[in-house]
Amino acid sequence: MEPSRAPVLGRLLPPLLLLLLPLYPRTRAKYVRGNLSSKEDWVFLTRFCFLSDYGRLDFRFRYPEAKCCQNILLYFDDPSQWPAVYKARDKDCLAKESVIRPENNQVINLTTQYAWSGCQVVSEEGTRYLSCSSGRSFRSVRERWWYIALSKCGGDGLQLEYEMVLTNGKSFWTRHFSADEFGILETDVTFLLIFTLIFVLSCYFGYLLKGRQLLHTTYKMFMAAAGVEVLSLLFFCIYWGQYATDGIGNGSVKILAKLLFSSSFLIFLLTLILLGKGFTVTRGRISHSGSVKLSVYMTLYTLTHVVLLIYEAEFFDPGQVLYTYESPAGYGLIGLQVAAYVWFCYAVLVSLRHYPEKQPFYVPFFAAYTLWFFAVPVMALIANFGIPKWAREKIVNGIQLGIHLYAHGVFLIMTRPSAANKNFPYHVRTSQIASAGVPGPGGSQSADKAFPQHVYGNVTFISDSVPNFTELFSIPPPTSSAGKQVEETAVAAAVAPRGRVVTMAEPGAASPPPPARFSKAVHSGWDGPTPSYQPLVPPEQRRGKPASPNTSACTQPGALHPRSEHPFPASAPRAAHRAPAGLRNPVSLPAQGLGHARHPAPLPHPAPTLDALRPAPFPLVPNGPAGAVLRVPSLSPCPEWLRNLDSRCSVISAPLTPFETSDPAGLRNTRDDRLDPARPSRTLRPSSHCLETDIVKLVSTLKPSLGFVTSDLCFVRPSECQGPSHGLWQKDVFSSCQNKEDSLSF
């Protein structure tokens, strides 16, 4: 499901690293040591940018006395000095020496006649050598580049062993650093800490996104770019720290740091292009042609970066102060950057055209990274032509790191998983990634290749430890452009429709008899089915018994049918009964309804009495396969620990023994449990005064006769429960009256 992420980076990096590590030129270190032998009469040695007052050169030269006499020439960066003589083919050795001002002590004569040179003759194995050890301080009106050359005009060539230490003051932060490198170590350490913080925050945000199944490939690539950036800065700090100590440093470490820096840039650039094309935002896969284009482009960009590093190490003239982009490879990188921006613009515009609802993300995303795309080439051009050479490296280093920090910081802010973040790009889970292809005919993407537009709408970020119930009840609107979803979890396609209870019997078991018809003796207009159950308590036991605290709703005098708003007339003897004073008051229900907002008009004919509605007994049939008892969710406000489809409504006539109940307010009778043949054993229920009834069977009894269906009736208001508070249990009791979707539909 993921595009090819420039595989050349992983395959080419190790061999390129081995190729580039030996290329670092040793002559650029500020501790310069070497053995020169040349047939020329004028040779460049090294350069250094000294401070205005604290620059110093300490040297030790040694050459055969037969090669006498040689001179050390000190040029500075004035146009009449070094630029006038370096690579000037029309000037010979004497002409190059003529631009030197002797009054400025710019010539060190390596002979015994020149006292300031510190030369003396030594003999080794029969050969006489001139050994010169001394130093020179540099003062100027500003920081200047100084260039050191060796000359012997009219001679037979040059031969010299040299060792030079060029310093700026005695501080650890300045001693071995050239003036144009001041502050680089401090800047790198500061940005290392900042990028480490960004990387840690990105890992934390990635952890949150993973918990919500929103950790997509593009965010992983951003995390990888930030991590590689941290490694790059770490190696830069190691190099500059060692350089500050001995003035040499480790060139291989610097090359490795540059490779990591370029890799971080390439990964982030690829991330931006992929996001512009809508990968993981509006599509789950880049088309084959798009993957090929990305692979070719990233391969070309990678090779250009490698060529730039090789060119800088091998072909940059140490006699000139050059910036990285002052080369054909550098200008090629600028061109590739501009091409990447054009591609980025086209991809973002296409994504916005097909998915306009993603404007809150793409508009600021496009505006922010337009500045970033232009910052790199503009910085290169300004560095090449607008920044003085004696301050270029430290300024460019700070600007370059600032550009990288801007890019990573903006991305981190725009993709933070916060409810207040209106620019969050991801709305499809990682477990619902769909294939996405190229736009179809007419520029529209095919329906089976793109993400459904806002499958989840606006993502609500809540605590990971709390389930997000809002998503359980949110149903996406049907759309013809919805892509094929691939779910990691089992799809609940075989589950019965919500709110419908499906019961099945074992094959071969006895089927329930057809519903009987009520006799029309009570009223000529009444005709309805006989309920599919028999009351457990005989009529003679129900009459004349006081109501217990757990009296069921369907046996109370004058109580409403649980699924009907029409009261049944109660007989006079039953209406006259009252609860004993020692027991709690039974639940009383209003005759007009159960707190429901809607009251349909009463039936045009009177309702029959309970005695007239009582059907003839017939065999009971279990509700589950092989006689098993099915558990169904209780719809009454008072939860039951065991509620079955064949539970009965009964009248409790006698108290229980103390050990059978834990209710401190009263005892409960379990006669209904003992008389229930379908209940395997007596099960204690939590004591409550709320109404309990078998809604499923009672509604199946009266539904055809009453001619209406109540699908979202909530039976009891919380105020009607008179039982004591039971903490969290009481919270669950009233939760069933708060969501209409929790009720059954018949």
UniProtKB/Swiss-Prot annotation:
The keyword Glycoprotein applies. Glycans are attached at N35, N250, N458. Keywords: Glycoprotein, Membrane, Transmembrane, Transmembrane helix. It comes from the Eukaryota. This is Transmembrane protein 145. Residues 669-679 have a biased composition (Basic and acidic residues). The keyword Transport does not apply. It is a multi-pass membrane protein. The chain crosses the membrane at residues 9-29, 189-209, 221-241, 255-275, 296-316, 332-352, 363-383, 395-415. Residues 567-581 have a biased composition (Low complexity). Residues 505-604, 662-684 are annotated as: Disordered.
